[in-house]
Amino acid sequence: MIEGRISQLDLENRSAVIVEENGNRIQVNFALRTNVEVIEHETVGLMGGELEDLEEGYHVEVEVASTNEDGSIMCDSIACVS
């Protein structure tokens, strides 16, 4: 699992850059089947969402499906935790 903040989000290309607490930047690609969960503000619980619900600056947890040859990762699921 990768934890960090979304520093760049490219919805058109289904990708993002996640910055970990140590400053490490990770390129993340989202498959069509990627599970997205976002905070539901009334209950402060997680609910199903879409890639378009994510925003730069959100703190997220990313489940890695695979690592590409260029070092980027393919995301299995992403959950917004802030």
Which role does the model predict for each range below?
Residues 31-39:
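Structured surface patches comprising rigid loops and adjacent beta-strands/short helices at the edges
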